[in-house]
Amino acid sequence: MDEEHNIIMVTTNYIPGKKITRIIGTIWGITVRSRGLGGNIVAGLRSLAGGEIKEYSKMLSDTRNTAMERLRDAAEQVGANAVIELRFDSSDIGQVMTEIVAYGTAVVVEDVSSDIQRVGLS
């Protein structure tokens, strides 16, 4: 859970110990990034040697984090305290830009009452 925003974000369709009291709907956080000419040249030179291209890995990691922050903001704006079924999608725009979308279902959850007795089978 993100303590700063108090938004629970999970890839599952449920949250252990919580019950969904309201489904708000699909929300998303979108960002588009470009590496820039200098970064593309450095990454291109590194690709000649093979292996990981750390410049692109860092850019994509930062871009995913930005998309997640925007998804959290969207959840707060619609009154959700959780996002279930969190997913990512990406696509290229032209040859120099990458779009990252974080999306999921905004919901309101509350703790499962501890006063419910569980009935076991004998």
Curated annotation (Swiss-Prot):
SUPFAM superfamilies: YbjQ-like (SSF117782). InterPro entries: UPF0145_dom_sf, UPF0145_YbjQ-like. It comes from the Archaea. Belongs to the UPF0145 family. This is UPF0145 protein TV0671. It comes from Thermoplasma volcanium (strain ATCC 51530 / DSM 4299 / JCM 9571 / NBRC 15438 / GSS1).
